[in-house]
């Protein structure tokens, strides 16, 4: 048995790992319940304006009728499965592709909620890893003969895993910091938020032009980003020319 497998089996029998697993299940379920209820009741999911890239997507999704309701039912079902210990693995299997899609969508539209969706995705991956002893049989990887070391369900250790939780804190901090610098400009959640952000930019004119392109002209995100990059380049060239003079 490898050291990684030994660590896994030890973790399954650790009280603090089990507490963290329960926390992840509850937190991820709570992330789906409000949005699921909104969809089932036939209400619009967010207050994002239709001109916002993600708001435009949600507007189109809202117009799909019972498909919109179906998504809400799926989210509520997934949340319920996560909260029930016997069905938690099935809930995690359903949760992962859903949150992966949401996370990619958030990054593609430069939504402000990328931090939350990233942490939710990492949480779902953790839950799948927690039940590795049950899902390993469908994975295309070579498995060692660890049948003699079943994953322990009973608590056999109360030792606090400082290294693991230190890694969790470091991961959360990394997600927050990376998301601050990953995009040089975002559309914000409204025109006001976008314009307030562009005033503090080194290229305020280009940034404000980007906000105007998104919210007033209603152009696609890719088109506005291209215009922003061209305008930013002109500002940079003008600044260099002024410095050389």
Model-derived features: positions:
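Short, amphipathic, aromatic/basic-enriched membrane-interface segments that mark the entry/exit
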Residues: 59-66, 83-92
């Amino acid at each position: 048995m490898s050291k990684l497998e030994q660590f896994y089996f030890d973790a399954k029998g650790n009280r603090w790992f089990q507490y963290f697993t329960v926390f992840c299940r509850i937190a991820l379920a709570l992330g789906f319940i409000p949005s699921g209820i909104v969809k089932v009741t036939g209400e619009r999911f967010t207050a994002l304006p239709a001109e916002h890239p993600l708001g435009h997507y949600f507007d189109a999704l809202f117009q799909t009728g019972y498909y919109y309701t179906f998504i809400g039912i799926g989210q509520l079902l997934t949340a319920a499965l996560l909260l029930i210990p016997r069905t938690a693995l099935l809930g995690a299997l359903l949760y992962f592709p859903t949150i992966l899609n949401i996370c990619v969508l958030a990054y593609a539209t430069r939504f402000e909620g990328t931090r939350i969706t990233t942490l939710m995705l990492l949480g779902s991956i953790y839950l799948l890893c927690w039940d590795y002893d049950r899902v390993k049989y469908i994975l295309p990887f070579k498995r060692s003969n660890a049948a003699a070391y079943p994953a322990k369900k009973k608590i056999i250790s109360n030792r606090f895993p400082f290294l693991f939780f230190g890694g969790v804190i470091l991961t959360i901090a990394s997600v927050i910091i990376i998301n601050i610098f990953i995009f040089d400009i975002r559309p914000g959640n409204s025109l006001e938020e976008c314009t307030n952000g562009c005033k503090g930019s080194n290229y305020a004119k280009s940034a404000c032009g980007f906000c105007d392109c998104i919210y007033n002209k209603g152009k696609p995100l890719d088109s506005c980003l291209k215009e922003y990059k061209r305008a930013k380049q002109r500002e940079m060239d003008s600044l260099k020319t002024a410095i050389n003079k």
